[in-house]
Amino acid sequence: MKSTNRPSVLLAIAVSAVSLSAAAQNMKPGQYEYTTKTEVFGITIPVSFKQCVTQKDVDSNSAYVNQQGQKNCTPPDVKRNGKEMSVKYTCTDPKMSFDGTGTVSEDSFSFDMKVIQHEMNNNVMRTKLTATRLGDCK
């Protein structure tokens, strides 16, 4: 199996999984600033971006998790309990498992995700994501 650009692929999967989800009960639609820090192979990769979260995103949980999933991945299993949220899914190519937990409020959320890369000696990648509402969408 090729390992070229593997950290980039894994980061893209993790960020898209985390960054496109919302809290149906608590999160208020609007413009959010997302900040992620992903640690893989001893390197920390920071990413920041802004995203407009709509009421549809909130109602479908897609502000936190890409509900279509990634190619070769199961759809995310999203569970909500009040302000707490958990997400799990697996991928077959490359073979990985994702397990994350987070806390949601009306104008912010935080999320921690652990990704196990099974084809790379069960290497663990961790992503921490925070998002803060900046105001209405522009």
Label every model-predicted segment.
Residues 46-101:
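Central antiparallel beta-sheet cores of small beta-barrel/beta-sandwich binding domains
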Residues 46, 94-100, 112-114, 123-128:
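Short, surface-exposed coil-to-beta transition loops
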Residues 34-37, 86-93, 112-118:
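Short beta-strand segments that buttress and anchor functional surface loops
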Residues 19-21:
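N-terminal signal peptide c-region/cleavage motif recognized by signal peptidases
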